[in-house]
UniProtKB/Swiss-Prot annotation:
Residues 33-64 have a biased composition (Polar residues). This is Nucleoporin NUP42. It comes from Xenopus laevis (African clawed frog). The FG repeats are interaction sites for karyopherins (importins, exportins) and form probably an affinity gradient, guiding the transport proteins unidirectionally with their cargo through the NPC. PROSITE patterns: ZF_C3H1 (PS50103). It is found in: Nucleus, Nuclear pore complex; Nucleus membrane.
C-alpha cells in the first residue's frame, strides 16, 4: 500500500479512514503530531467532564460515552452525551386547567356574564368538571338578572326594524310565553282580500288609511321597546311573568282588526254571508240547535245572506240562496223542512215514500198529486201538476213567471202543464226569459217501435247478409250495422 503523502506532511484529513498507509513510529514527520493531537483531545474531554461533578450521580450515562482511547470518539462525542437536568421533578398533583375557562352556562342569548375563575393551587381538585352543565338552566325563566331579557327584546326589535321583515305580525320571546301586546297579526292574503273588497266598493282610500294606521302603530311600538322607560320595563316584566291564557282550539279567538270587525268567527257567533272580510256586521246567525261539522259555515257562494239553522238540525223556516254553501233547513234523512240546499223544497223523506212537493225542485218538476219516488217519479209516468207558486230564487236570475211544460227523464208528457213558478230551476230559463216551453219527448219512449239493437233484414245489404250467414267474418268486410233478429242463433 502506498504511503499517504499528506500524512507525512501532517495534513491528512482522513485519518485512519484514509485508503493510503499511515506509517507508525519514526516514519514520517507528521505521525508524532497526530498522536499528540489525540492525547490533547482526550485530556480536554476529561477536563470538561470534571467540571460537572453532579453527573457522577448518574452512572448510567457512561453507557452513552465512548472510551477515551478510541480515536473514533473524537468526532461528535459531545453530541452523544445524555445529560439529565438536576432540577427536573415529577409532580403527582393534578391541576384543573379548565377552571380558568368559562363554563358552558356562562353565556346568555345575546350577551355574556362574568365568570369567577379560580387559580390552580397545585392540590388535587375536588370540583366536578361537569357541575356547570348539570346546574345550567336551559330556559331563560331561571335567570335572576332580568336585564338580559330586556336586552334580548331590545336587540330583537332592532333586528326586526332593520331587516325589513313582515311587520304585521306578533312577537314572542319564547314559544312557551304569550305574545307581547301591541302588535297585530295580518297575513298578506288577508290584506289582499280587503283591498279587493274596498276596490269593489269604490273606496280604496279606506284600505290605504287602515294600512297606514297599522304601520304607524307598529313603528310606535317598536320605538317603545327599543328604548323602554322604567314603566315600560316594569310592564314587560309583569307581562312575561304572568301566566299564559288558555288557548281555544280552532279559529275561535277574537281579534280586533283595523277594519272594524272580527277576523274569525267565535264558537257562539258566526259572521254573515255578505263577505268574508274585516267589515263590521251587526247581523249574526242564530246559534245552531245541533252542531254540525258540515253546517258551520254561513258563507254564500254568490253573496246571499241566509239566516237559517244547520242542514242536519231542527226544521226552521229560512230563505237561503238556491245554490250556495249556506246551511239549509231540510233534513237529508227524513225530517220535514221548508227549503232545500239546492233550491228544492220538499216535505218528503230523502229516499222513501210519496211526497207532496210544495215548490219547484232542482230540475223543474213540480208535483202535488202523483206519488213520487226518491228521484222524482217512476220511469215512463206522467206528472200532472196544478198551479203552484214557488218562492225559490234562481241561481242566475230573479224570479219570473214562466209556464213550463216538462217531462221526466224517462217518461213522456201526455198533458200540458199549468205550473207557474216565480223562478226557473237550474235547468230552466236562466236569463229571465218568459216563454212557453214545449213538451220534450224522452230519449226512449213507448211509441218508438224501432229497436236499435237489431237491423231489419230488408235494410241489410247482400254483402252484410253474406257475412252474417258465414261462420266467420272476412277481413276488411266486417258489417257496420247490427244483424237482424232472425240471424242470431243461440247454441
Amino acid at each position: 500500500m502506498a504511503i499517504c503523502n499528506f500524512f507525512l506532511q501532517g495534513r491528512c484529513r482522513y485519518g485512519e479512514k484514509c485508503w493510503n498507509e499511515h506509517p507508525r513510529g519514526g516514519g514520517g514527520g507528521g505521525g508524532n503530531r497526530y498522536q499528540s493531537q489525540n492525547r490533547y483531545q482526550e485530556q480536554s474531554r476529561y477536563q470538561e467532564q470534571s467540571r460537572y461533578p453532579e453527573q457522577s450521580r448518574y452512572p448510567e450515562q457512561n453507557r452513552y460515552q465512548e472510551p477515551a482511547g478510541n480515536a473514533k470518539g473524537t468526532w461528535g462525542a459531545s453530541s452523544q452525551r445524555y445529560v439529565q437536568p438536576s432540577n427536573f421533578s415529577k409532580s403527582t398533583t393534578w391541576i384543573n386547567r379548565d377552571s380558568e375557562k368559562p363554563s358552558a352556562g356562562s353565556f346568555s342569548g345575546f350577551g355574556s356574564r362574568n365568570v369567577k375563575s379560580t387559580a390552580a393551587t397545585g392540590l388535587p381538585s375536588t370540583q366536578n368538571r361537569f357541575a356547570a352543565l348539570s346546574s345550567q338552566d336551559n330556559s331563560r325563566d331561571g335567570q335572576t338578572d332580568k336585564g338580559n331579557i330586556l336586552d334580548d327584546i331590545m336587540k330583537d326589535m332592532e333586528i326586526w326594524e332593520s331587516s325589513g321583515q313582515w311587520m304585521f305580525s306578533v312577537y314572542s320571546m319564547l314559544k312557551e310565553k304569550k305574545n307581547i301586546s301591541g302588535f297585530t297579526d295580518f297575513s298578506p292574503e288577508e290584506l289582499r282580500l280587503e283591498y279587493s273588497v274596498c276596490q269593489a266598493e269604490g273606496n280604496p282610500l279606506k284600505y290605504i288609511n287602515a294600512v297606514q294606521q297599522l304601520g304607524s302603530k307598529w313603528k310606535q311600538r317598536i320605538l317603545e321597546l327599543k328604548n323602554p322607560n322604567p314603566s315600560i320595563k316594569t310592564a314587560l316584566l309583569n307581562e312575561l311573568n304572568s301566566p299564559s291564557p288558555d288557548v281555544t282550539p280552532g279559529y275561535s279567538g277574537q281579534q280586533n282588526s283595523a277594519f272594524g270587525a272580527l277576523s274569525f268567527p267565535t264558537s257562539n257567533t258566526a259572521p254573515t254571508a255578505v263577505t268574508f272580510s274585516f267589515k263590521a256586521d251587526t247581523t249574526t246567525a242564530a246559534k245552531p240547535a245541533v252542531p254540525n261539522a258540515l253546517a258551520g259555515s254561513d258563507f254564500s257562494a254568490f253573496g246571499n245572506k241566509p239566516t237559517s239553522a244547520p242542514s242536519f238540525g231542527s226544521g226552521v223556516a229560512a230563505a237561503a240562496a238556491s245554490f250556495s254553501f249556506a246551511p239549509s233547513t231540510i233534513s237529508g234523512f227524513g225530517s220535514t223542512a221548508s227549503n232545500s240546499g239546492f233550491g228544492a223544497a220538499s216535505n218528503a223523506a230523502g229516499f222513501q215514500g210519496a211526497a207532496n212537493i210544495a215548490a219547484a225542485p232542482a230540475f223543474g218538476v213540480a208535483s202535488s198529486t202523483a206519488p213520487a219516488s226518491g228521484f222524482g217519479g217512476g220511469f215512463g209516468t206522467t206528472v200532472n201538476t196544478g198551479a203552484k207558486t214557488s218562492s225559490v230564487r234562481d241561481l242566475f236570475s230573479a224570479g219570473t213567471a214562466v209556464p213550463v211544460q216538462t217531462t221526466l227523464l224517462f217518461g213522456q208528457a201526455t198533458g200540458s202543464l199549468n205550473t207557474t213558478a216565480s223562478s226557473t230551476s237550474l235547468a230552466g230559463q236562466p236569463f229571465k226569459a218568459s216563454t212557453s216551453a214545449t213538451a220534450v219527448s224522452g230519449s226512449f219512449t213507448s211509441d218508438n217501435t224501432s229497436n236499435p239493437l237489431f237491423t231489419p233484414r230488408n235494410e241489410l245489404s247482400v254483402e252484410d247478409l253474406a257475412q252474417f250467414e258465414a261462420k266467420q267474418f272476412t277481413l276488411g268486410k266486417t258489417p257496420i250495422k247490427p244483424p237482424s233478429a232472425d240471424l242470431l242463433k243461440v247454441t
